[in-house]
Amino acid sequence: MANRGPSYGLSREVQEKIEQKYDADLENKLVDWIILQCAEDIEHPPPGRAHFQKWLMDGTVLCKLINSLYPPGQEPIPKISESKMAFKQMEQISQFLKAAETYGVRTTDIFQTVDLWEGKDMAAVQRTLMALGSVAVTKDDGCYRGEPSWFHRKAQQNRRGFSEEQLRQGQNVIGLQMGSNKGASQAGMTGYGMPRQIM
């Protein structure tokens, strides 16, 4: 963490719970996908959450990733600078987040800049990258590079069209889900609260 001291008490417990959500196997899969997707000379980071954070922290890898998901000439982030200044790095991370939202990642799946830059919640960073990969696989526009089975495909709209005659036929059928229209009924039942008449 950049400028934060150690946490104690309840905040320590919360931080430990957040850190338990981080998945090392998922980290390896995401690193492999990012390197394959960017198709550039991006060095493979050593394993571990701290190295993964350091690898993504300046925002250049993330910006290259989102640019690689667009056709050449349509990249959302035209200028990527490898700067050592903190505000430039945080600006690049926020540019990536805006571009990811424009690409189709839901706002609920997007991490906050401090989650990555200060290493507060690297599991949220993993969730965002997984959501980005899922959207890329679902779009199937030829820009995704990698194994399609690495990410789940999001559900697509599948509209059905029925003619008026088919709709009328459906109204005449009593479905099995409704049960039988024969047998026991409530005929002869008395109202609620009335005594039962036994003769």
Swiss-Prot record:
GO molecular function, one term: actin filament binding
Keyword Membrane: no
Skewed-composition ranges (Polar residues): 176-188
Chain positions with Phosphoserine modification: 163
UniProt keyword list: Phosphoprotein
GO terms under biological process: actin filament organization; central nervous system development; negative regulation of transcription by RNA polymerase II
A Pfam cross-reference name: Calponin
A GO cellular component annotation in the UniProt record: nucleus
Tissues and organs where the protein is expressed, per its UniProt entry: Widely expressed in the brain. Expression is increased in the superior frontal cortex of alcoholics, but not in the motor cortex or cerebellum.
Domain Calponin-homology (CH), residue spans: 24-136
Calponin-like repeats: 174-199
The keyword Phosphoprotein belongs to this UniProt entry's keyword annotation: yes
Region of interest (Disordered), ranges: 176-199
SMART domains: CH
Similarity-based family: Belongs to the calponin family.
Protein's UniProt name: Transgelin-3
Organism of provenance: Homo sapiens (Human)
Taxonomic lineage: Eukaryota, Metazoa, Chordata, Craniata, Vertebrata
